[in-house]
Amino acid sequence: MQLLSPAFAYGAPIPKKYTCQGAGISPPLTFVDVPGAAQSLALIVEDPDVPKEIRSDGLWIHWIVYNLSTTITNLAEGAEIFAVQGLNTSGKPVYEGPCPPDKQHRYFFTLFALDVVLPEEENVTRDQLYEAMEFHIIEQAELMGTYEKS
């Protein structure tokens, strides 16, 4: 399975339009070779480079989406999501564009193929989603982009 974006390659800068300095819309994503046994998909976008004085765990969650249909092969930029969105670190169930406070940060987009459709819960956090996905991840794929404020 692969997670790709026509907007940026793995390790490349994320275009400004997908950040807090632009429109702040979600980037286009493409899902390739999703396993046939998958019953649903989940997506987590996170920044592990947050200064410890801002977040003690050094992690900022930008987007959580789960129970995406396995028939979906892509998400257009700024796409309306027909799945469940969990809470980002700001406490909102939406995409929050990169907005590093200090230097260039890495942003990991991780796609999970699951062997179940997860129970739909309100206000799911990253940790709760990982707990729900435990023992159900068939495969995962990662796309990493970078961003530094100009």
Curated annotation (Swiss-Prot):
It holds the Pfam family PBP. CDD domains: PEBP_bact_arch. It comes from the Bacteria. Disulfide bonds: none annotated. InterPro entries: PEBP (IPR008914), PEBP-like_sf (IPR036610), YbhB_YbcL/LppC-like (IPR005247). Signal peptide: none annotated. Belongs to the UPF0098 family. NCBIfam families: YbhB/YbcL family Raf kinase inhibitor-like protein. This is UPF0098 protein CPn_0877/CP_0992/CPj0877/CpB0906. It comes from Chlamydia pneumoniae (Chlamydophila pneumoniae). The lineage of its organism: Bacteria, Pseudomonadati, Chlamydiota, Chlamydiia, Chlamydiales.
